[in-house]
């Protein structure tokens, strides 16, 4: 897991998300606390519970983006789920325990990648032997093998086609749940896996070039060197101690005032979430997984519902509240220019593929920010996503005609922006439908 300090985590998030300092700080502290807990001695470590976070803020201000960037930073099993996808236990749909099962799968993937990297050198050696077998046959004399090995290492044989045998990972047949046994997902795939192991594993013949064959062969050879049971044990431990679950759209499962019935995918889901957030044991096909130390970060826009509409017990289990602020004109300007993969940089790169050079002046960027702020205040506040609508509208004509204008340069200034979106932005009725 990551050993970044809170300041480093915040500065990493700053590269992609403008503003929202409070939310970044809360997330950075929570992530650092995971590392701090690991440094404690055994007796105290069990007592330190994660402080779950609730992020509240209008749509399009960076809640989901913070979670996406955090996933890359965490270096720990991390899963982002929408609360709206789940239904109460007993109804058709996914129950919330599936979150932990998916998290374990992610944990296994992480541990396997780490272990593969450790045996990379040995696996590469074995892969080279298999490529030589395919090139000269296993009965060739040592002298022939060595001369081909030299050519292989010099890259002279990279484009030569060879037939190799690689493990067949199955046809991806869907599994099915056994009623009354959640988590015991038995499928055709599992049965074929069982038979495959009994018969020494299934393989398939693939025709490929020497250079491309290495990826499959190295993976194949590394998997032979790995101990699957140890990987599963380590992954379950990693999920129990370092797992992070990001619950998006939590406000959509809050009960509205005056609504009739509990709502299959509303209050019922909240009730099912309670034990998960508090700490329970979930049965997975890799064994039981305790959720006592899994960190939950929930977020929601809370346009219609309020945080107080959530079940009181669930509110109590999300002790850290962070409010994200609506975006100002200056924020929009910075989003367009300062983020690492800003929209302007993206459009410039896209047009450069047609040999068209886009140049945005400072007043054009101001005008774009102005239009976005105006539309957000007069129509509906959708945050930074409004910029995409405005940019698409401004660059619509250029994008369409780009292939015919290759080799030229286009300057986009304030006049150009006003010409393309000014009239729409001014007419509120029109912009309700178009922007």
From Swiss-Prot:
InterPro entries: AAA+_ATPase, ATP-dep_Clp_protease_ClpX, ATPase_AAA_core, Clp_ATPase_C, HslU, P-loop_NTPase. Signal peptide: none annotated. GO terms for biological process: protein unfolding; proteolysis involved in protein catabolic process. ATP binds at residues 18, 60-65, 248, 313, 385. It is found in: Cytoplasm. Keywords: ATP-binding, Chaperone, Cytoplasm, Nucleotide-binding. Belongs to the ClpX chaperone family. HslU subfamily. ATPase subunit of a proteasome-like degradation complex; this subunit has chaperone activity. The binding of ATP and its subsequent hydrolysis by HslU are essential for unfolding of protein substrates subsequently hydrolyzed by HslV. HslU recognizes the N-terminal part of its protein substrates and unfolds these before they are guided to HslV for hydrolysis. A double ring-shaped homohexamer of HslV is capped on each side by a ring-shaped HslU homohexamer. The assembly of the HslU/HslV complex is dependent on binding of ATP. PANTHER family: ATP-DEPENDENT CLP PROTEASE ATP-BINDING SUBUNIT CLPX-LIKE, MITOCHONDRIAL-RELATED (PTHR48102), ATP-DEPENDENT PROTEASE ATPASE SUBUNIT HSLU (PTHR48102:SF3). This is ATP-dependent protease ATPase subunit HslU. It comes from Agrobacterium fabrum (strain C58 / ATCC 33970).
């Amino acid at each position: 897991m990551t050993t970044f300090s809170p300041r480093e985590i915040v500065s990493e998030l700053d590269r992609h998300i403008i503003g929202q300092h409070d939310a970044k700080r809360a997330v950075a502290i929570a992530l650092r606390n995971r590392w701090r807990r690991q440094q404690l001695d055994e007796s105290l470590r069990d007592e330190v519970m994660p402080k779950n976070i609730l992020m509240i803020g209008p749509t399009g201000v960076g809640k989901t983006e913070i979670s996406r960037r955090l996933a890359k930073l965490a270096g720990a099993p991390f899963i982002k789920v929408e609360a709206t996808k789940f239904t109460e236990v007993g109804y058709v749909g996914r129950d919330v325990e599936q979150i932990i099962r998916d998290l374990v799968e992610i944990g296994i993937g992480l541990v396997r990648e780490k272990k593969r990297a450790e045996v990379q050198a040995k696996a590469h050696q074995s892969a080279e032997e298999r490529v030589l077998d395919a090139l000269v046959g296993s009965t060739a004399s040592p002298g022939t093998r060595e001369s081909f090995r030299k050519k292989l290492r010099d890259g002279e044989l990279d484009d030569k086609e060879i037939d190799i045998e690689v493990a067949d990972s199955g046809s991806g047949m869907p599994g099915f749940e056994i009623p009354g046994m959640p988590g015991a997902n038995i499928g055709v795939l599992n049965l074929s896996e069982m038979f495959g192991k009994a018969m020494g594993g299934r393989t398939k013949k693939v025709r490929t070039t020497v250079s491309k064959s290495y990826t499959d062969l190295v993976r194949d050879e590394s998997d032979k060197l790995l101990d699957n049971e140890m990987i599963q044990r380590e992954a379950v431990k990693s999920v129990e101690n370092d797992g992070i679950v990001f619950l998006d759209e939590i406000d959509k499962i809050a009960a509205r005032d005056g609504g009739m019935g509990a709502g299959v995918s509303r209050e019922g889901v909240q009730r099912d979430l309670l034990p998960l957030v508090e700490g329970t044991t979930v049965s997975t096909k890799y064994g039981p997984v305790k959720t006592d130390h899994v960190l939950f970060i929930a977020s929601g826009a809370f346009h219609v519902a309020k945080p107080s509409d959530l079940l009181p017990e669930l509110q109590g289990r999300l002790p850290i509240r962070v409010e994200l602020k609506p975006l100002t004109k200056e924020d929009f300007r910075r989003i367009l220019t300062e983020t690492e993969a800003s929209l302007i940089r993206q459009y410039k790169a896209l047009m450069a593929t047609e040999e068209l050079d886009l140049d945005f002046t400072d007043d054009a960027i101001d005008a774009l920010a102005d239009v976005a702020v105006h539309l957000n205040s007069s129509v509906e506040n959708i945050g930074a996503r409004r910029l995409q609508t405005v940019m698409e509208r401004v660059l619509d004509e250029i994008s369409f005609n780009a292939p015919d204008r290759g080799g030229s340069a286009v300057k986009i200034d304030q006049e150009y922006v006003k010409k393309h979106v000014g009239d729409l932005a001014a007419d509120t009725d029109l912009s309700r439908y178009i922007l």
